[in-house]
Amino acid sequence: MPSAAYVAGLIDGDGCITAFLKRLKTSPHGFAVKGRVKITSRSLRLLEAVHRDFGGQIVDRGDGLFDLCWESFEEIERLLRTILPFLIEKREQALCMLKLCSLRRSRAFHKKVEFVRRIQELNSGASTGRGVKRA
């Protein structure tokens, strides 16, 4: 049984916490806010063990890799609240995602978009200097 600290390490190392806007004609704004937490691994056995205790959906990518994904804001919030004390590299993304989760029933679309952009900025490394080559 993987611990919350172990799962946090997987997400810090081989995972992703992201948010994005998806076109949705039925939405008043023309977009829906979506979130995703994902761990990628060659080990299906590992992801099945994490899935048993932490939920999510396993996807066979067909290239020898598997993804374990959490995509509903309820699942994402439950997962991140459990592993947050142990996250290091993706802690800021997790905190922003938790704020986004708390807004899931809000009509403040502009506020949701702010958090989507912040998460994307953190993932690009623009705010931390990661991804920038140093001499």
Residue ranges and their predicted role:
Residues 1-135:
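Internal intein/HINT superfamily modules and their associated LAGLIDADG
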